[in-house]
Amino acid sequence: MIQELTIHNFDVEIRKDRPVVVELYTTNCNHCKKLSGILDKLSQEAEDTAYFAKCNVDTETVIQQRFDVTAVPTLLFIKDGEVKNRLIGEVHPLVIQEDIKKLR
């Protein structure tokens, strides 16, 4: 299951003992919906090696500004609470898997 993040739990949830993948999305974005389906599947396959979360930047504008989100979907790849990589737009699952491997 992918955790929904808000300003209240964001900083705690991105500090995991494994790589963290955060999808920054909006509710009316078709590309975001497609990517969410991909991430749901990947989160089940990789639940022991990566932590998946998402954040609606329509409602969490502080997070949108903090990470300078200008397009959605945006994926943040985080290790030790620090963003190590960012991908924008629809992304192939293999690219996401490779970026997770780089964080280990």
Predicted segments with their positions:
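N-terminal "domain-start" segment that seeds a small globular fold
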Residues: 1-12
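CheY-like receiver
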Residues: 12-13, 63-66, 99
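Short active-site neighborhood of thiol/selenol oxidoreductases, capturing the structured segment around
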Residues: 15-27
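Conserved helix-turn-beta segment immediately C-terminal to the redox Cys motif
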Residues: 16-19, 36-55
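Conserved redox-active cysteine motifs that mediate thiol-disulfide chemistry
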Residues: 24-38
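Structural micro-motif
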Residues: 61, 67-76
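Non-catalytic, surface beta->alpha helical segment in thiol-disulfide oxidoreductase systems
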Residues: 79-104
